[in-house]
Amino acid sequence: MEDFVRQCFNPMIVELAEKAMKEYGEDLKIETNKFAAICTHLEVCFMYSDFHFINEQGESIIVEPEDPNALLKHRFEIIEGRDRTMAWTVVNSICNTTGAEKPKFLPDLYDYKENRFIEIGVTRREVHIYYLEKANKIKSEKTHIHIFSFTGEEMATKADYTLDEESRARIKTRLFTIRQEMASRGLWDSFVSPKEAKKQLKKGLKSQGQCAGSLIKAFRRTSPALRILEPMWMDSNRTATLRASFLKCPKK
């Protein structure tokens, strides 16, 4: 599973996942399924933000990666992937600037258009079950919840899906692709079932083979994130900024 993750996800996402697991004292060599789950969740958060900006009129617009409008404001602030101290600093700054109510738990994103925090969920189970678990944990109507599954299902607060259908289709296609690639390597069952994962761990099974280089497209506009095992597209300037911000070691 570890080899699969390193082949299938953007190196920055892998690095962020490693950092997150280290922060919580988890060993990715042992908790390989959690490593894969964290990388998947991070990628969905980044894809959620991809292409979405706010223009000078305060309207939400979708900008293609080749579009020269680099000075537009990103619609979503990405909170997930930062160390806890920095993440809470970002949340506090958003609350002070926008007047938003401070959440009890760290959310994944902030939507500047709708002025709300968003909790993203990616589940291997039934979406409604995971949604209820998230809602019971958060216990706040101020935080918007959006759940995706590997089967293409989704569920969101008050059926408000925030993004346009095409943007959500990119995310669903990517998740379905990850599932198919795991299944082709005999990893999917262990990813879904902890019992099966323990069996594979005891047997010392490792994923084999190189990732395929085929391309799956979702509608007209397709993020390179959907290239099955190639790094997801991100604006180069934003990538540099995020890397400096997310991976910066906190001062002791």
Curated annotation (Swiss-Prot):
Q: Which family does it belong to?
A: Belongs to the influenza viruses PA-X family.
Which Gene Ontology molecular function entries are recorded, alphabetically?
A: RNA binding
User: What GO biological process terms are annotated to this protein in UniProt?
Assistant: viral RNA genome replication; viral translational frameshifting
The role this protein plays is:
Plays a major role in the shutoff of the host protein expression by cleaving mRNAs probably via an endonuclease activity. This host shutoff allows the virus to escape from the host antiviral response. Hijacks host RNA splicing machinery to selectively target host RNAs containing introns for destruction. This may explain the preferential degradation of RNAs that have undergone co- or post-transcriptional processing.
Q: Which Pfam families match?
A: Flu_PA
Task: Provide this UniProt record's keywords sorted from A to Z.
Answer: Decay of host mRNAs by virus, Eukaryotic host gene expression shutoff by virus, Host cytoplasm, Host gene expression shutoff by virus, Host mRNA suppression by virus, Host nucleus, Host-virus interaction
Question: What note about domains is in the entry?
Answer: The probable endonuclease active site in the N-terminus and the basic amino acid cluster in the C-terminus are important for the shutoff activity. The C-terminus acts as a nuclear localization signal. The C-terminus is recruited to host protein complexes involved in nuclear Pol II RNA processing.
Location comes to: Host cytoplasm; Host nucleus
Please tell me the species this chain comes from: Influenza A virus (strain A/USA:Texas/UR06-0195/2007 H1N1)
| Gene name per UniProt | PA
Q: Does the keyword Chloroplast apply?
A: no
Name of the protein in question: Protein PA-X
- Active site positions, chain numbering: 80, 108
Q: Where is this site: Important for efficient shutoff activity and nuclear localization?
A: 195, 198-199
Q: Which domain of life is it from?
A: Viruses
Q: Where is this site: Important for efficient shutoff activity?
A: 202-203, 206
Q: Which cysteines does the record link by disulfide bonds?
A: none
